Amino acid sequence: MNATPEKADDLIVVGKIFSVHGVRGEVKVYSFTDPIENLLDYPRWTLRHEGKVKQVELVSGRGSQKGLVVKLKGLEDRDEARLLSGYEICIARSLLPNLAADEYYWYQLVGLKVINQDEHLFGKVDHLLETGANDVMVVKPCAGSLDDRERLLPYTAQCVLAIDLEAGVMRVEWDADF
């Protein structure tokens, strides 16, 4: 394991180590990629947790009932592996595939101001949730918000009218009373 991290502002969180597996240093990983196995396409990860940063290399990985089971280079026993529980798995932003003009990664949406068709500022996108039907944006109030309510808005074509990453704004069709 190498201690030289990527630049912090260039890193995207793509998973999290949540436990150990067996006695040979394997770890259980929750992948934020879709499908979850896509995380295994990235051979080098930057791990972050409570100010600590480590570079690691992927040796192997496989699917399991609750995510992935992964073997990292230099991690040989259960006790070493346990120390990585809770670490976020990050990759360099430049490694992500390019998307079509009307597609966005979740990290690009977080922090956008959300304004409805009546020019009411609802707040900023705090995070997104994956549900069975569609993704849901959690919009939390910010300075200048219409009110102090947290809103859950569907990330659908019917709700999201326009996204301007440069301006930091998302326009939505959503009644202020919902």
Swiss-Prot record:
InterPro entries: PRC_barrel-like_sf, PRC_RimM, RimM, RimM_N, RimM_N_sf, Transl_B-barrel_sf. Residues 101-178 form the PRC barrel domain. The keyword Chaperone applies. Gene3D superfamilies: PRC-barrel domain, RimM. Transmembrane segments: none annotated. It comes from Pseudomonas putida (strain GB-1). One of its GO terms (cellular component) is cytoplasm. This is Ribosome maturation factor RimM. The PRC barrel domain binds ribosomal protein uS19. One of its GO terms (molecular function) is ribosome binding. It is found in: Cytoplasm. Belongs to the RimM family. An accessory protein needed during the final step in the assembly of 30S ribosomal subunit, possibly for assembly of the head region. Essential for efficient processing of 16S rRNA. May be needed both before and after RbfA during the maturation of 16S rRNA. It has affinity for free ribosomal 30S subunits but not for 70S ribosomes. One of its GO terms (biological process) is rRNA processing. Binds ribosomal protein uS19. Keywords: Chaperone, Cytoplasm, Ribosome biogenesis, rRNA processing.
